Curated annotation (Swiss-Prot):
One of its GO terms (molecular function) is U6 snRNA binding. GO terms for cellular component: post-mRNA release spliceosomal complex; Prp19 complex; U2-type catalytic step 1 spliceosome; U2-type catalytic step 2 spliceosome. Gene3D superfamilies: 3.30.70.330. This is Pre-mRNA-splicing factor slt11. It is found in: Nucleus. The gene is slt11. Signal peptide: none annotated. Residues 237-310 form the RRM domain. Keywords: mRNA processing, mRNA splicing, Nucleus, RNA-binding, Spliceosome. Involved in pre-mRNA splicing. Facilitates the cooperative formation of U2/U6 helix II in association with stem II in the spliceosome. Binds to RNA. Belongs to the SLT11 family. Its main location: nucleus. The keyword Nucleus applies. Residues 155-232, 333-377 are annotated as: Disordered.
Length: 377
């Protein structure tokens, strides 16, 4: 019988554990996580010793996460085994060690790394060792790390909100404007065309190299009554939404329009920057169109809302098609002069009255055909 792994002297330093040391960001919200354990599945990226790998998924659509370093190195570095970020501040360990001035040359060869990890493994299990060095660091450096961990991108508030209140006057509830950070929990400012390309230079023209204000597009024009009033066809229960940006998810549109009624389907095309909102009932579509009044803002993205128009695929009657054809001919004929129109009509009438003088030969096979079998020969 071959010897066990722990009985082998060369394998006695390999790590075996039943639970990983992972931060909350790497774990899903569900407290019941299914993990796959593989003993000695890979070598640690720091000490190069074989260790136990744990694999799991945050949800069904997420990628599979796994541990990258062994538990001993994770406890020595006070970091997560998966993302390798500091457990106290959530920062990279390189930034943390530079701020705490704990950067020291470690072992370079693989043998020395294994010896270093094995030497500190027993000390960590007893509650002493390199972990105590983090408690002896400077408090100012730890405060710097806290500010780095809680920092967010810079966002400048509007000037009227930064001005102090004069004469002790307080603003009413109607004048109060709440502006939250665009990177926080609340929604940010509404995106406009000026915020994307900057303020245009004053000048003439329709924009471009000469500067000036460009001509507004159809999405910037005010909505008309045809966009708000329901169409005459009672079978139309769809709304056509334009202005959909690439970062506006489909579930945000669904949660915004589902409050007016049950949705039959929602078709969103980020490539075409539009979406179709198909309601199950006509009353729900009318309520949504009445509430939006041709415009809507979803997660800071301005949208244009109008009624959907079905495309007629050759389902008109013959009389209706001939009527449209006559209207087209009449519209073209009214553009010319009256004399030229009269001459053209007269010439056409004379040509129609001329009888056909050319005899056309009948097609082959139209006459009586005589076969040899019919003659009896």
């Amino acid at each position: 019988m071959p010897p066990q792994i722990k009985q082998d002297l060369n394998r006695s330093g390999w790590e075996t554990t039943d639970f990983p040391s992972v931060c909350e960001n790497c774990l899903p919200e569900n407290p019941y996580v299914q993990m796959l354990k593989e003993d000695y599945g890979a070598e640690c990226k720091i000490c190069t010793r074989p260790f136990t790998i744990f694999r799991w998924k945050a949800d069904r659509t997420a990628r599979t996460k796994r541990t990258n370093i062994c538990l001993t190195c994770a406890r020595l570095k006070n970091c997560c085994q998966c993302c390798m970020l500091d457990l106290s501040f959530g920062l990279p360990i390189v930034v943390r060690d530079a701020a705490l001035k704990m950067v020291a040359p470690g072992p370079q060869s693989s043998i020395n790394r294994e010896y270093y990890a094995q030497g500190h493994e027993k000390e960590i299990e007893e509650g002493r060792g390199a972990v105590e060095e983090y408690e002896k660091t400077d408090e100012k450096a730890r405060e710097l790390l806290r500010r780095l961990a809680n920092s967010e991108p810079y966002y400048r508030k509007p000037r009227q909100l930064e001005a102090p209140e004069e004469d002790g006057e307080t603003q009413g509830p109607s004048d109060a404007t709440v502006v939250r950070s665009r990177y926080g929990n609340g929604p940010g400012p509404v995106r406009t065309s000026e915020s994307r390309r900057g303020t245009p230079l004053p000048g003439r023209g329709r924009g471009g190299v000469r500067g000036g204000r460009p001509f507004p597009g159809t999405a910037q024009l005010p909505p008309s009554q045809a966009d708000i009033l329901p169409p005459a066809d009672p079978n139309i229960t769809s709304l056509f939404v334009t202005g959909v940006e690439d970062d506006l998810p489909e579930h945000a549109l669904r949660s915004f329009f589902v409050q007016f009624g049950q949705l039959r389907s929602l078709v969103c095309s980020h490539r075409a920057h539009c979406a179709f909102i198909n309601y199950a009932a006509r009353e729900s579509a009318e309520a949504a169109a009445k509430h939006c009044q041709g415009k809507a803002v979803v997660q800071g993205c301005p949208l244009r809302v109008r009624w959907g128009k079905p495309k007629a695929l050759d389902n008109m009657d013959r009389e209706e098609r001939l009527k449209y054809a006559r209207e087209g001919r009449q519209a073209v004929g009214s553009l010319g002069n009256a004399d030229q129109g009269t001459k053209a009509i007269t010439a056409g009438t004379e040509k129609e009255q001329i009888p056909r003088q050319v005899a056309v030969a009948p097609p082959p096979g139209s006459g009586e055909v005589q076969y040899s079998s019919m003659s009896g020969d």
